[in-house]
């Protein structure tokens, strides 16, 4: 059997990474001459059936090589595997490409699905995939193989279902494909300080997933278009990256993220200059004292005026949260404008009344009965009770222009997860989710607003690589959870911060209390913050917003001012606080049971 061998020469690295491709199209990735990943099948689902390399339905026609230069990542050479898809009396070449780079320690995988649309009447589950390339066996190679993994998954940047374990066939690495995110694979014998691979999508982040299947008693990691998509357009191309670092989990994650930022030419300008990331703010969201809890006998207009006059900290903006707009079917937003019982004189009046104090403002998923459908192109989902603008740039431009005129500097897009899974067309129509977020981001850029993602799946903040106006994303659950249940460590965002920060986005811990007990809140009579210093510390070192949500006369000024200058400028580190490599390794080595919390960050003086 013949092998095609390609060798990475990684500058300053004592080890090498190889990709070996045999004459059947199978490939192995080795680290230090040890096999780390072996390929499985390549497959396409169309016409309600699978075409696969496992049988003769997707035969390999030829293997060729090519080389070239990318303006961003430099020189490359690649192997091209051409398969023949025979359907509807037509033969379509399907090209799978494996590219290696001369100056970047990564392998990139591309699948070109051919010049015919891939249609089907019977769709697969959303957590499955309908195009498969690449795919890797999840296996322990021998008795000396001690590798672990972790991954982020679920809401809040993957905080909800982040998990870790040993890399073997019995591990459930991907639990729900659509909810999942990057997979970090590392050497446990080095306590996470050495060889590391990061596996993640490289394109079409809203439409593609990693999934895990079992075939012939083998556990397999597969990447491709989400199984619920009804069709894949002609000439579609998906991309995937396997990034290698010899410098451990944290450094490897940062290098991976920096590489993706280079691919998408993401600028750091908006994050660096975001007022809400640089200065203290006052928050009234779920965990803030005044969330759904105005001063007695008043509305939010009066309450916010009183807060502005009485809260004695150098805050530079205030938050307007989910209590200000009209809600409709299934709790979605029906009309994103101020209710008169909340703001009798409307938001522009309040902005002027507070001396033109900037606002950050909340939004959620769109209700089925949203009032905009008569004026703009709008898609309805009666089954999910939700709706969405049909990637109509004029809608987002009108909406965010109005917000800017209210005094808004940051738009918070919350409930991203439910807008994605409750709105069926995003799961069935390829590119719709991409267009939704792109249109929002382009409009924000036109009017000069930044965006904060909340309740995001990993796919959302990966998509934000293409949307530089997304400057921040929540990496933890709502702070109210912490106030009501001290056994739920809402503050422990060291894993999600690692991934979010690597992508050029500031992780957000959510609002905080600076005093432990603040009576008569909406969170129950036993609500409290057991460790206010910890809450302030984690918010500060996250590099995200530091948002105070205290009751009037309950702010501990001494505590708050430890995190900032007298003018409210936050004294933040150079990178977000993250879990140290050794604790990540212990987490995996103990099959996903956390062994404590220990964090690190750094600052250049």
Predicted regions and their residues:
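Non-catalytic C-terminal accessory modules of carbohydrate-active enzymes
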Residues: 56, 60-70, 553-605
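Glycine-rich, histidine-containing beta strand-loop boundary motifs that form or position
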Residues: 111, 124-128, 284, 322, ...
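Carbohydrate-recognition beta-sandwich/jelly-roll modules
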Residues: 16-318, 335-341
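Mature catalytic domains of secreted/periplasmic carbohydrate-active enzymes
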Residues: 215-221, 331, 418-427, 434, ...
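Cleavable N-terminal signal peptides of Sec/SRP-targeted secreted and luminal proteins
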Residues: 1-15
